[in-house]
Design a protein with these regions (language model features):
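Mixed-charge, low-complexity intrinsically disordered regions
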Residues: 1-82, 91-165
Length: 165
């Protein structure tokens, strides 16, 4: 199912207007890691994510906002699910909480693991800007709700559970 098809199905089932804006993207730009993170979302383990603020600045993209919808994509381009941001905050890297790290659902869910993998993930953004990684650099922390878990429910043979953000 494409992002457009999933958005149509979600809107039709939930009563959300199809004119409501949404974005479609893959975690980490896709690949095996992106697919793994999408599966964590579908399993209900991952309810948050983080990006370096610098990445938004480099790409000249607007910051996410509470209430915005996204269709999460797999590396294949197949839509995995619909999420909606419920909280967006800017926090320095060295002040990200263990609670947020746990919500991200990755690895052992510890803050130490989160810092290790996100330092590795954010470093290329700093390098692209000609800067060294900054422990005090701002992170865009997002919390989200999974609204349309089509792949997870399809595998179970159930209908997707629906809600509105």
């Amino acid at each position: 199912m494409t992002a457009e098809q999933m958005w149509h199905a979600y809107c039709e089932s939930s009563g959300v207007s199809e004119q409501t804006p949404y974005s479609a993207w893959a975690f980490c730009g896709g690949g095996a890691v992106g697919d793994e993170l999408a599966q964590l979302v579908l399993a209900g383990t991952k309810t948050a994510t983080a990006s370096a603020l610098l990445a938004f600045e480099l790409e000249q993209e607007p910051l996410p906002k509470v209430g915005e919808y996204s269709v999460i994509l797999l590396d294949s381009g197949e839509a995995a699910g619909v999420i909606c941001d419920t909280k967006v905050t800017l926090v320095p890297f060295d002040e990200v909480s263990g609670e947020h790290a746990y919500r991200e659902g990755e690895g052992d869910r510890s803050l130490a693991y989160w810092k290790k993998v996100h330092r590795e993930a954010f470093t290329p953004d700093f390098e692209a800007a000609g800067k060294p990684f900054d422990e005090h650099g701002l992170c865009v922390l997002e919390e989200f709700a999974l609204l349309y878990p089509a792949i997870a429910k399809k595998r179970e043979g159930d209908k997707p559970s629906l809600s509105v953000c």
